[in-house]
Amino acid sequence: MLEACKDPGLGVRSLQARGITGRGVNVAILDQQLLTDHPEFADRIAAYYDTGCEGETASMHGPAVASLLAGKTIGVAPDANIYYAAWPSWLMDSRYAADALDWVLEQNEALPEGEKIRVVSVSAAPGSADMFQNTDLWNAAAARAEEAGVLVLTVEGAGTKPDRLMPYPAVLDPNARDDPAACRVGFPSEDGSSVFAKNALALPCSYRTTAEEYTAGQFGYTHYGQGGLSWGIPYCAGVMALGWQVDPTLTGDEIMRYLLSTAATGTDGNSIIDPVQFIQTLQTERGA
């Protein structure tokens, strides 16, 4: 089970076998602190910044999201480069997330054209005033990212206009991991969900294995029979990285439209991300 669920599913490994691995694409992650030496992603961390994680250096969340996006054996885009900014989300203060995003934008400014950071994966909701304080600081930073052409994807959606793409958790079928039509929205413990809005996109979260490291040099893996939407955001960012490798001219809005228009229909009638159809459509329609 541990090994089988390293597979991202939905045909991603067939794309990787064709050389579509996110190579040359720069992405960012804002999440909890991370020990950067895990073999899954040690050579993928381009830069690391700590906004003030109270002296903590390790977490459960950090290595999980990094491995799901760009892990060597787990990730959707194992050759993407990660700019990682750690922020203490448990303090429920979005000023740290805003600081993290501004750091990403500073890194982005220093990068040459053709090597810009394309997407920021945020497995949290720093724009939610019901959960966090100082959301105005986050919203201002997200607006700056939008102006810079950097797509910010959180559990609430896409950047300053989250309803452009509304993420939901999906369950992979253990017996048909590569078939998006065998997926459904929700969690393994649920019977199913109703059909959501047209811009909803369900992302694999359950039946996944992630990297783990709580003590420097003690590398491990954990299997999750049930994962939350936190696992889906880096998955989606990874699929986007595959798309940008195939066609670097895509804007953030364009890549979201393609993800939505190529989605498969799951067993409950909801839209499930379909990486293979997404890439095939880009190659056909854009000559990529």
Residue ranges and their predicted role:
Residues 31, 147-150, 155-245, 249:
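Extracellular S/T/G-rich loop segment that most often corresponds to the catalytic His/Ser-adjacent loop
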Residues 1-27, 51-55, 183-187, 273-274:
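N-terminal domain-start motif of subtilase-like serine proteases
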Residues 113-123, 136, 148, 245-288:
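C-terminal subdomain of the subtilisin-like protease fold in secreted/lumenal serine endopeptidases
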Residues 22, 87-171, 222-234:
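Substrate-binding/access-modulating region of protease and related hydrolase catalytic domains
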Residues 9-13, 62-70, 97-102, 135-142, ...:
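Extracytoplasmic/secreted envelope proteins and their assembly/folding machinery
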Residues 14-46, 53-97, 113-118, 193-197, ...:
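Subtilisin-like serine protease catalytic core
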